[in-house]
Every structure is written in structure tokens, then in C-alpha cells.
Swiss-Prot record:
Matches recorded under PANTHER family: 60S RIBOSOMAL PROTEIN L28
Natural source organism: Arabidopsis thaliana (Mouse-ear cress)
Keywords, ordered alphabetically: Ribonucleoprotein, Ribosomal protein
UniProt name for this protein: Large ribosomal subunit protein eL28y
InterPro entries given in the database record: Ribosomal_eL28, Ribosomal_eL28/Mak16
Primary gene name: RPL28C
Length: 143
């Protein structure tokens, strides 16, 4: 079965797909966002599109106390999207998770252009999963 090139797929889906969110920015400028699962920065562009690129990276929360899921797509099973995702759960502290994400994204020239976006998404998700410390409240000593 012949595969369709990513450039052609992007030309077909860039203006009309179910993940597209169009909003007005400042003035009359339209801003287009994307709700794709494999889009790290949620911007409607060819570089970040999970539909048009064969190699995609996704970082999601696994649950409250379960850590972060790092997903990369296999390039061989493009016609079976559910089977084409490698998922690994990261449960360590942030510094180790950031090393793993950086190595996975840049390793073997997978998608080195997405390293900064992947680390930013990991940082945002890990901050959201962090639990606030409970302890005695500090009192103001000026009273």
C-alpha cells in the first residue's frame, strides 16, 4: 500500500479538520489553534501537526499520582494509528524525566526540532501534577 506524503495531507487538512479552533486575536487577525493529541504546542502548522508528520511526540498526564506519559509514533504502521504509538510512563523526579524526554526526542534524529516544545510541555504538566505542601500556615509577625 502506497503512503501519502505529509505535504499533501497537510494541504488537504490545514484549513478544515475536526481539531481546528479558529479565534480572533488582536484586531482582525485570526489565530488558529489545534486540539490534536500529537501536537505539542497546539498551533495549527505543518511543523507541529500530528496528522501530517510521520514522526510525532506527545506528552500527557497519566493520572493524579501515576506520572507522565511520553508517546512517540512508529513510522512503519501509519495505516493503523492505534498500534503505531510507543508509550512509556515516567514516574521519576523532574530532572530525570527531562533527561529522558530530551534523549527520546533528539535520539536517532527522531524530531530534534521539537525538543524545546517537549520540555516546555513536560514542565507544564509536571507543575500541574505537583501537590501543594500541607503544613502550618505562616503568621505575620508584625501584629
Amino acid at each position: 500500500m502506497a503512503t501519502v506524503p505529509g505535504q499533501l495531507i497537510w494541504e488537504i487538512v490545514k484549513r478544515n479538520n475536526c481539531f481546528l479552533v479558529k479565534q480572533f486575536g488582536r484586531g482582525n487577525a485570526k489565530v488558529q489553534f489545534s486540539k490534536e493529541s500529537n501536537n505539542l504546542v497546539n498551533i495549527n502548522s505543518y511543523k507541529h501537526s500530528g496528522l501530517a508528520n510521520k514522526k510525532t511526540v506527545t506528552i500527557q498526564a497519566a493520572g493524579k499520582d501515576q506520572g507522565v506519559v511520553l508517546g512517540t509514533t512508529k513510522t512503519k504502521r501509519q495505516n493503523k494509528p492505534k498500534l503505531s504509538v510507543n508509550k512509556s510512563i515516567l514516574k521519576k523526579e523532574f530532572s530525570r524525566m527531562s533527561k529522558v524526554v530530551a534523549n527520546q526526542v533528539v535520539d536517532n534524529y527522531y524530531r530534534p526540532d521539537l525538543k524545546k516544545a517537549a520540555l516546555a510541555r513536560l514542565s507544564a504538566i509536571s507543575k500541574g501534577l505537583r501537590v501543594a505542601k500541607s503544613g502550618p500556615k505562616r503568621r505575620n509577625r508584625q501584629a
